[in-house]
Every structure is written in C-alpha cells, then in structure tokens.
Amino acid sequence: MPRAAKSSRKKDPNTPKRNMSAFMFFSIENREKMKTDNPDATFGQLGSLLGKRWKELTSTEREPYEEKARQDKERYERERKEYDTKLANGEKTGKASAPAAAAAAKEE
C-alpha cells in the first residue's frame, strides 16, 4: 500500500531570514578565491577546504567574521520579535493559508 503524501506546512514568506554564522560569512567572502585556487574542486570539496582553512584561523583572524555574526544575530532577534508581535496582534504577515481561506469563504 503506497504511503499517503504528507501535507507540509507552507512557510510564511515574511518570516525573518535566519542569522548566519561566522563561518558562513567567512565562506561567502572566501569561496571565489578558493574556487580560483582549486578550479577542479567540487562544491563539497570547496566546503571541506573552506572548513579546513577556517579551523586554521587564529582568534584574531576570526574576530571580524564573529562580529558580523553577532550583528546578524541581533538583526534576526529584532526582526523575529517584530514578526512575533505582528502575529500576536493578528496582523496578516502574508498570504492566507488554504484552510483559513476556505473557512473565510464558507462563512460568507
């Protein structure tokens, strides 16, 4: 007997974007250089090389990326708080879900 397809919950497009880690900021900044230095490397291999390079950094070299990560975390927490407040106040944050739209249509 085939499994029934799970209905996944639609993600609200207005949900704040998650905060990035210090390593992600490092990866974004260094991926292109790593790609030119290793032109035959696959995406996964580049990730491994970036991870190895990240582990070799001193705490002083990591600091700018960690600062960016702290600032991004503050941004995320601020935006998430605003988003949660809007939800609690009943403000619409995006398109209505299918069940909510069906219920609204049924009431009319």
Swiss-Prot record:
InterPro entries per record: HMG_box_dom, HMG_box_dom_sf, HMGB
Keyword Ribosomal protein in annotation: no
Localization per record: Nucleus; Chromosome
One record GO biological process: chromatin remodeling
Any Pfam family matching the protein: HMG_box
Keywords of the record: Chromosome, DNA damage, DNA repair, DNA-binding, Nucleus, Transcription, Transcription regulation
Outcome of gene disruption: Double-knockout with abo1 exacerbates the sensitivity of the abo1-knockout to methyl methanesulfonate (DNA damaging agent).
Compositional bias per record (Low complexity), positions renumbered to this chain: 96-108
Family annotation (SUPFAM superfamilies): HMG-box (SSF47095)
Cytoplasm listed as a keyword: no
Annotated segments matching region Disordered: 1-20, 61-108
Highest rank taxon of the organism: Eukaryota
PROSITE patterns with a match to the protein in the record: HMG_BOX_2
Summary of subunit composition and partner proteins: Weakly associates with the stable spt16-pob3 heterodimer to form the FACT complex.
Record's function text: DNA-binding protein that induces severe bending of DNA. Required for DNA-binding by the FACT complex, a general chromatin factor that acts to reorganize nucleosomes. The FACT complex is involved in multiple processes that require DNA as a template such as mRNA elongation, DNA replication and DNA repair. Also augments the fidelity of transcription by RNA polymerase III independently of any role in the FACT complex.
UniProt name for this protein: Non-histone chromosomal protein 6
Protein encoded by which gene: nhp6
